From Swiss-Prot:
Keywords: DNA-binding, Metal-binding, Nickel, Transcription, Transcription regulation. Coiled coil: none annotated. Pfam families: NikR_C, RHH_1. Belongs to the transcriptional regulatory CopG/NikR family. Transcriptional regulator. This is Putative nickel-responsive regulator.
Length: 138
């Protein structure tokens, strides 16, 4: 084993692993490990960007979630009320029988928006959260 490499074990739902394997095969990765390293690097880069942003921004928070997970819809509504001072509007889209997409337009201090992102990201049933910073307020 190469020095500096640590072997880990990860438990994943079968459907998630199957989809991941399909994608890495399509993209031509030589191994699952390399694809996981690439995914982790991407996650770290996005996290560092989120942490480095400061000041006032305008953007959209895109949230993909499984609405069958008990309480997730109510939690998202409650959070939007709790953060009403930075949320200008939201749009809810039913993607299929299981998944919904919420687009939340935000405007305000990045520090406050980060708190919202973290709370939504940690919610059970939320599958993906992406903050797209459209412009910095001048």
């Amino acid at each position: 084993m190469e020095e500096g490499i640590t072997r880990i074990g990860v438990s994943l739902p079968k459907n998630l692993l199957d989809e991941f394997d399909r994608i890495i095969s399509t993209r031509g990765y030589s191994s699952r490990s390399e694809a996981i390293r690439d995914a982790i690097r991407t996650y770290i880069t996005e996290y560092r960007w989120l942490e480095s942003e400061k000041g006032e921004i305008v953007g959209v928070l895109v949230v993909l979630y499984d609405h069958h997970v008990k309480g997730v819809s109510d939690l998202l509504i409650d959070l939007q009320h709790d953060f009403h001072e930075i949320i200008t509007s939201s749009t809810h889209i039913h993607l299929n029988e299981d998944q919904c997409l919420e687009m939340i337009l935000v405007k305000g201090k990045m520090e406050r928006i980060k708190v919202l992102v973290d709370k939504i990201s940690a919610a059970r049933g939320v599958m993906n959260v992406k903050l797209i910073s459209a412009v910095k307020k001048v």
